[in-house]
Amino acid sequence: MAGAAPRRLGCDALIVVGGSAMPRRVLHVPVHVRACNLTQELSTGEDARFCRPRPVNVERVRAVFAALYRACPIHVRTEPERVKLVLGRLLLGPVAVPCFCDGEVEGHGEHLVPTTQFCRGPLLYVHRRCCCGSVTAGRALSYHVLENHVATHVLRGLLSLTEWNRELPSLFCDCPGGGGASGTEERYAMACLPRDLSLHLDDYPYLMVEIGRVLSVSEVDDYVTAVSGYLGEAAAPRIQVHYKLLFGLNVRPQAPCALDATRDFFLLELQKLWLGVEYHHEVTSEFFGRVLAQLHRDRARVMMALRLPEQTVCHLSTFVLSRFKRQVLYFKLQVSYGKCRTGHADRSGGGGNGGNQGHHNLLCYRRLSVTFADTDTVWRNLFYVYYELARDLGSHGTEDRPVSRGYGVSCASRTSRLSPSESTVVSANGHALSSTALPTTSAGHKLSLPRDPAADRVRRYVCIISRLMYARYGERWRKHCQRRSETGEEEEEETLESGETDATPPFDFTGQQLRRAYQEHRRRKHLAVQRYAPCRRKLIGGMEFAEVTGVSLDRIAVNAFNTNRVINMKAALSSIAASGLGVRAPRLPKNMTHSFVMYKHTFKEPACTVSTFVSNDAVYINSLNVNIRGSYPEFLYSLGVYRLHVNIDHFFLPAVVCNSNSSLDVHGLEDQAVIRSERSKVYWTTNFPCMISHTNNVNVGWFKAATAIVPRVSGADLEAILLKELSCIKNMRDVCIDYGLHRVFTQLELRNSYQIPFLAKQLVLFLRACLLKLHGREKRLQLDRLVFEAAQRGLFDYSKNLTAHTKIKHTCALIGSRLANNVPKILARNKKVKLDHLGRNANVLTVCRHVEAHKIPRTRLKVLVEVLGALQSISGTPHTREVIHQTLFRLCSAAAATSGLCSSPPPLCVSSSSSVPSVPTSVSVDGSSEPTSPRARFASR
């Protein structure tokens, strides 16, 4: 049959045109010529004709759909994309272009519909067939633009984009004489339908039936959102109107049907809000139970209250602040409290119709005003129903509740629920909510409110549906546009990587989808190779809870390890009441210290410190300040331990990291003293030898042996500071980095997720230096590769539980306080000294600078001299070679004075004109002769 609609047979549907009948064609007709809108003159009359009731012919509707389906461009090949293009034309809606035809062409065009109307605006004068000599000259027409003339015909069709009509045959010739070329640069055009295939209002739901055979409702919604964003705000109202027509919202049901549908729709929305609440217990179920019960009792008032706009100020006559704070906490709503000034909002009718131009979503009680977020208007209205409309629910509902007059609802109704005799909807944890109407209490109450006329109810129903349907789509698209304008193109590409494609257009308007898909494929293939890179790790809890934050600049990489973080969060006390008082009270164990300055109790354990700020306003909410080191799961574990000691009912996540301290080591530096000697705009602390550099309003402290601490920041802010510090180090004049060692130690840190202890680092340093001494500098690359492969295979792995040189509370809790006190020390000059007194990150040159030659055996001094000589031969800067030469000169001179180890100092490799700052000697290593006792032998090692 000619014009048959596409049907699903297997996977793809085909349009089969049977017989010898020619398929009716859709032609391209301009709607803007020389900045003149040709559709404006007939818009009122055509809208009236379009809305006029008319019997629907299903076969004609299928023929219209088939004609539009065939009118798709050639590059749109798949069935869903072709149906989306048909949907796009239907969303833009019908248009009409007036024209005046002379006797030569009258009656010859199958697309010209006869009419008689005087047009003051522009219209097309179709005067003859084009005689330009082109291929289509015998078919196409020519036109000119007229004004103040009578229109004899009308061209009707659907508004389309010009890019959709590129391959459609044009009704007018494209030559300059024909006039068709003048409208090709406009954005919009018309897909002109034959005269017997014109559309009417009642045809749209039947066209949606044809679309629904290919596309789902969610795909249609996504496409509508994409088209609205692509065409802009000017075309959005037109798209929304035709979108509603596709779903038959123009069909006005009878009054009882409309009321029942509206009630069911509100019940469905309230149930969706209830299922979206995270906590299902007595507080949340009592709130929604009262709202639903009031909806069944007084449906009209509650529905009007739930539709209050954000500009309307809601006044309450009954309010309980402690209960409200607890409800807001469990619903996770952001509210702010203030004073309600007189004159900002005048109270009236059902909730105060006065407006405050400066504030929105206000809920006022006496002098107190509560401001909700811009997206929480529905929640504001729910609280208005709960406290104002449902305050006397106990006298009319299914269970008796104490009625409060003036000062709020009694605390006895805090845990009340609806009667189990009602038809209920059960939540996941057993709490039930009513979803059916309550029985009518009395005839007087039933007839207390006058009924509206049927037409007003139907109109109200359509308004409610339209508001609830399109508010979410518009809000989602505005957020997407705002995020795209703020973050730019890079974040959009990252969104494509992560799979969040809700806001991306599902249809290729510009023809760039294939190229973007290819670029995304290449990017994913590149990232698949780097799946084990630190930047690709998935962090539980986000970057704020990352134990390791790594950045790299050129070939320099730095890993910052979190030492401790301070986390703020809220918690609610459990329902365990004090004996005989009926009031919740915190259970304070003996290990919690009380602060006499404020309402604070401190809970200290080796793993964490929790400061509890107790509320004194009977809200039963505690503010927690947690000081801990560890990952997000360890933080949750510490909260569980804290919950065993204190009667906490719920912790409210997500937690906020307000302070985070990190520590980092710069590996591979040949001379670690350069970092603190070649920095400008710094200052030194007086009580401790620490250099402070100010970066992004954060004071970064640099200690000896290229170790730094970064306070207060974490996540992206920490990465920005690390990049700036690396940039300063990279631009220093005398900085030389051994990238072989740098790569090995960076890999060790990432492999063990902990900073390298002093002994583990010295083992790798001296082992590599001895290998260089044995095999020479020519084998340096092979030796560096060998050491790196050994580190990758775990030969130099270490345990963070053995790094007791830093008294970390979390580490002490894991290994025990007795083992944590066994700090590795050495015996120097009959005194115990920590192994890392020179710095945990000290390298060979830093260690040898502090060695006194006359205090160590001759054989070990010889090894040190040979190691320094090997390092001097591979050094990359004259400054480092000069420092090594001075160290060798000091060691050999001191040894020659006693044992004659070096007959003469080694030759100077570079000029000694530049002065090197001397580093004060702190502690020397003992052992002038080979020790005999076991304790002395351990100390010498």
UniProtKB/Swiss-Prot annotation:
Its main location: host cell. Residues 488-500 have a biased composition (Acidic residues). InterPro entries: Herpes_UL87_C, Herpes_UL87_N. One of its GO terms (cellular component) is host cell nucleus. The keyword Glycoprotein applies. Pfam families: DUF587, Herpes_UL87. It comes from the Viruses. Functions concordantly with UL87 to initiate transcription from over half of all active viral promoters in late infection, without affecting host transcription. Acts on and binds to viral early-late and late kinetic-class promoters. This is Protein UL87. It comes from Human cytomegalovirus (strain AD169). The gene is UL87.
